[in-house]
């Protein structure tokens, strides 16, 4: 069949950016004023964002917050909020009358440990089926308005039940529809807007439903929504909804609300339980328990948490775990004597005896002095500053660069260490003793152009074997390789296990490895993966039997580039010439 001539344009855009794991991400376990528990999914990139979600970090000795210093220093953080014993959510219960509580009637939140029991708020009845739910707070002691309590009111307008959440001062904090429904009549079937009920549960910033009365088939709130959709909506089944034991009307039915509690100071077991929450996130490079030595009064409890964290990091090989040597020789409540060299060494030795050495664990000591928000010079913990240095270095230069020293380790707003300053050249022997005990120190040193500055000196892991992984930069390089290559390799799982696929893998990872050479992460590399093979007889790393069982092996060899540790300069005064020329003026 003949066709009229024409020009056809087809467009294909191959400029698709390859996604790579985010750099400069760390994770703190911390006590905060508010915020989600068990959900570090939101990446915190600014201090204002942290304040909006978590309020502020609770620092027992009143010093500068680790989280604040990390975020100001350039970190991107995942925050795991640690709760204490007795933590529970707040509840709402039926008020005696539809009125706002007077000031002297405000009910304080209960601090009784255990699972919170919700009171019935809304009851659904259809035929012989009766189910109900109550409401609890989403947070554990999180502020709702300005008071210790709040109120919730429900009213009905036409066919819709609405809710209002009232501050203790009577102002409305949140409002909206709960559910719209109309039971069957002579002309119409029962109609239920079950999606509105689902939206109420998911969209409220303060409250979440908790089932009170259930049946064999309706045991969760999701089951309730599904039951309304499949068994009630657009059926002949009648539906009655009661609020507070009676049908909702235009007159508001009021409930009293309490905030719940975040519990007492967490024990070692609560800190350890929270460690599991980081396992879902492999973009994290640095992990630490913020101010833990201020919460736990005995070294035994502190070391128990560090041991659990070290074991997890050694098993997963996904994170580096940072341990702060407490800045004082005792718990801050018992005294504020700064640690000296021998006290730092003794503490690290005790820690090593309890948890062992590991390339995934690093020790930071010395404390640091900052001016706080009131302009007072404060002895502060150092891990927030360390996170900021490590993450900024990773984001700007790559995680394979050391973040200690005068180029990437200067802390311009720091006012020196809490401990004696071991950064003076005349105290090198003492600083060297600390280095031999894996202590990464906050010191003051003279810089070429900025005078005396506070900085991090040393960037060692606690690897006992004297190989290149005693440098944190090499450990972080290996983590980078793992986090970057893993999604690429995962993409090829279930693909044909043959040399054509292996060649594609090599071509995809080669630019990444070449870039690492260009960026001085490694001086050279060799990728041995049979990518150039054309038959089973040409295999050198793999063998036919394994390949035909779906197994493929690659060996990546590289020569690492470690941070410069010693410079020797020989200054020689040249000898005078042995020949002497004497000239006489004539």
Indicate where each model-derived feature is located.
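Structured, hydrophobic secondary-structure cores that serve as assembly/anchoring elements
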Residues: 1-100, 105, 111-114, 273-586
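Small/polar, repeat-rich beta-turn/loop motifs that tile beta-strand-dominated architectures
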Residues: 1-33, 52-266, 270-276, 553-555, ...
